[in-house]
Structure formats: C-alpha cells, structure tokens
C-alpha cells in the first residue's frame, strides 16, 4: 500500500503586519486544509481560523471514510459547508467583522492511491509528478476567468491589478459552491496545497524544482516559504506538502 508523509508552514510575508492565513493537518495526516482570509486586519484572520476550526471539528466528530470515494466527496462537502456556516454566522452576528470571508482548499487522503481535493476561492492544489507541475484547481477569480476565456495570458494575469479579486469564497453567502477533484497518486508524487501568496511570487516550475531537489516535506515547506520571502512576499504564504513513497518506507 502507498505511504505518505506531510508537513506545513505559514508566514506573514514581507509586507503584511498580520497573518490572515491558517492551515490544518489532522494528527493522522488524512485531512489537510489551507485557508486565506480577507476582510480587514481582524476579519480575515478570524475567517480563516473559523474555517479550519470547523474542518478540524468535523474530523473530530466524524472522521472521513478511508476507502469509499463517494463518501469522501460527501465528507468534504459537509466540512466546507460547515466552515462556510461558521464564517457566515459570525459575520452576521458581529458588525466588526461583517463582510469577512476566506478561501479554502481541503484534501482528504484515502487508503492507498487516492486523494480528494475540494476548494473555494484561489487557494491552490498542485500535483507534482516526474518533475512536472500540474495545477489541479481552477482559481475562482476574475483574472483566471479571463485567462480561461482566452482574454489574458498567464503572464498578463500575474501583473493584472485585479488578480486578487475572487469570485467565490466562504462567508459571503449563506450557501457556497464547492469544486472537487479526485486525484489518483503514485509513489514519488507530491501534492502541494497553498494560499495565493506562494504562486504570486513563485512560478509553477519553481515550485516543482524545490520539491524535486529537497526531498523531505518539512524541508520542502521551509524552502518554498524562504524563496517566497526572498522574492518579496507581498502577501501571507502558507504551504502544505504531501509526499508519496513506496510502502516499505515512510510514516503512514
């Protein structure tokens, strides 16, 4: 059976006084989440914290199934909806944080060679395989909609003044639409979850190069954050890295 190991890091970056990102990694390394909050100095951090706490509570109350793909997809939907409810309700109850919201990307690892990804907003999931990066998620953002429509190139999107304007997030509506992606993985693959602070600075190929050279999830996370900081890090940056290894090695 395929094994895996994981690590996570977060940093406020070079230009932000407060870190509005949050992440979660369950003790059994089966549930992972990254959330990137928005809504002012207090609201953004609170929104992302509420989101990951709701996902953590879902794991505690009802851990995800380990083999049934449909049931895992349903579990992610329930967890993300619970996170949306938490942010939405807090914003309704507290005028000081009204309008706050957060992105989220969630991954649930099944037994063996399968992981399910769910996301809302522009936090991302990558599959890195054989030295090549594959973006698994489609950003819910104005600029990426323009890229998909052929109105902007990826290079133009990187410098577009509206690149941080998202079209979907947790907490802005009572109900939220969740995109999900099933991913079959194999030994030597990596899954990387991140807030948009990472790809704002590092290109996909640079992310893949770090993963290929560093080898251990904690070292990979440290190096990705370091290179982002070296590149100016205008935003908070958060990374979760999951490494898949042969069954005779590793921790899971």
Features from the language model and the residues they span:
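PP2C/PPM-type serine/threonine phosphatase catalytic domain
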Residues: 1-252
């Amino acid at each position: 059976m395929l094994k895996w190991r994981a690590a996570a890091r977060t940093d406020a970056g070079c230009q932000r006084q407060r870190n509005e990102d949050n992440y979660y990694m369950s003790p059994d390394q089966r549930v992972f989440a990254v959330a990137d909050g928005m809504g002012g100095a207090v609201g953004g951090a609170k929104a992302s914290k509420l989101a990951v706490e709701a996902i953590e509570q879902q794991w505690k109350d009802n851990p995800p199934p380990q083999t049934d793909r449909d049931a895992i997809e349903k579990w992610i939907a329930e967890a993300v909806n619970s996170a949306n409810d938490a942010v939405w309700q807090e914003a309704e109850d507290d005028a000081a944080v009204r309008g706050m919201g957060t992105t989220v990307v969630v991954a649930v690892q099944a037994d063996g060679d399968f992981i399910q990804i769910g996301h809302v907003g522009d936090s991302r999931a990558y599959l890195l395989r054989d030295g090549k990066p594959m973006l698994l998620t489609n950003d819910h953002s104005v600029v990426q909609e323009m890229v998909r429509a052929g109105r902007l190139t990826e290079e133009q999107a990187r410098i577009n003044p509206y690149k941080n304007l998202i079209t979907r997030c947790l907490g802005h509506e009572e109900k939220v639409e969740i995109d999900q992606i099933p991913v079959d993985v194999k030994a030597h693959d990596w899954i990387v979850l991140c807030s948009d602070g990472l790809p704002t600075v590092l290109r996909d190929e640079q992310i893949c190069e770090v993963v290929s050279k560093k080898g251990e999830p904690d070292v990979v996370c440290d190096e990705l954050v370091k290179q982002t900081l070296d590149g100016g890090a205008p935003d908070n940056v958060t990374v979760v890295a999951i490494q898949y290894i042969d069954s005779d090695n590793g921790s899971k």
